């Protein structure tokens, strides 16, 4: 059994020993920054067991989230949330249909849970861009103007590293004797391709305003400022908008630009 208390203590030790521990996480923009923030990414990864994803139907073909992506997102979550090893799919556009009402309905039971958990929104656009948000609470509608969420929320986007680039880097490292060829063999399968890798670009809460989350029966949104939403999805979960905002200091998240078509959308409970 995974020792939660022991892992929590080790995590705290890792963070306290970091040479960069006095840096403000609101300025972190990439997984490279995060590796500096935690002092040693290797020591972090050795502390936590891998994530198990629960809830995909055997018939679900277009799965948006992979365990490797979870490993990129975990460092930005609150320490106790990082310790959860099971992420549960609460809503999937492919499995449950394209409806914001259905999304809210699937998350309704979580509104009364006493446990402290987290929620990850994952979106895929027409150009295969993957992006989304982390929330400290389940998304639920407010018919009157009311923002929710707290400073744990953040926006993110993720890029897969092309296999040919990874393979070229592996060959370069081998030529320079920087890696052990035997250790690297399991990265390459029999077909000669390399397992997919992911690069995270994260946008934590800046403190500029408190417009973390705003949901109604007509739309779901995160982040705002100067008349724009950081991430906005319509009630049919077909169209979306993304803009830079003061709340998260984010860039445009979608590969399509400020307006995008939703090809896939999932909401996961962490814990």
Swiss-Prot record:
Bias kind Basic and acidic residues: ranges: 23-32
Domain of life: Eukaryota
Keyword Mitochondrion attributed: yes
Signal peptide: none
Renumbered residue ranges of the record's region Disordered: 15-41
Residues of the TLDc domain: 63-271
Primary location: mitochondrion
This protein's GO CC annotations: mitochondrion; nucleus
Subcellular location(s) of the protein: Mitochondrion
TM region positions: none
UniProt KW keywords: Mitochondrion
Keyword Mitochondrion annotated: yes
Protein family membership: Belongs to the OXR1 family.
Functional summary from the UniProt entry: May be involved in protection from oxidative damage.
Designated name of the protein: Oxidation resistance protein 1
Organism of origin: Candida glabrata (strain ATCC 2001 / BCRC 20586 / JCM 3761 / NBRC 0622 / NRRL Y-65 / CBS 138) (Yeast)
């Amino acid at each position: 059994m995974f020792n939660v208390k022991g892992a929590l203590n080790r995590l705290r030790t890792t963070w306290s020993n970091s040479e960069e521990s006095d840096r403000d996480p609101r300025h972190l923009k990439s997984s490279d920054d995060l590796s500096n923030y935690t002092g040693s990414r290797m020591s972090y990864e050795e502390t936590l067991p891998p994530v198990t994803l629960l809830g995909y139907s055997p018939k679900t073909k277009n799965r948006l989230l992979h365990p490797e992506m979870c490993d990129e997102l975990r460092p930005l979550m609150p320490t106790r949330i990082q310790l959860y090893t099971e992420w549960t799919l609460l809503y999937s556009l492919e499995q449950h249909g394209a409806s914001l009402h259905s999304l809210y309905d699937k998350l309704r039971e979580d509104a009364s849970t006493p446990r402290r958990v987290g929620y990850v929104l994952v979106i895929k656009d027409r150009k295969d861009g993957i992006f989304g948000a982390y929330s400290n609470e389940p998304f639920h509608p407010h018919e009157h103007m009311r923002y929710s969420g707290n400073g744990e929320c953040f926006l993110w986007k993720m890029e897969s590293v092309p296999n040919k680039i990874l393979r070229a880097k592996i060959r370069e490292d081998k030529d320079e004797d920087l890696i052990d060829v035997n250790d690297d063999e399991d990265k390459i399968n029999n077909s000669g391709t390399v397992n997919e890798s992911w690069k995270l670009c994260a946008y934590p809460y800046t403190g500029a305003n408190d417009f973390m989350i705003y949901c109604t029966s007509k739309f779901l949104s995160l982040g705002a400022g100067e008349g724009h939403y950081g991430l906005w999805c319509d009630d049919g979960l077909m169209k979306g908008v993304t803009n830079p905002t003061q709340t998260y200091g984010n860039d445009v998240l979608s590969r399509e630009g400020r307006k995008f078509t939703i090809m896939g959308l999932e909401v996961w409970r962490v814990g």
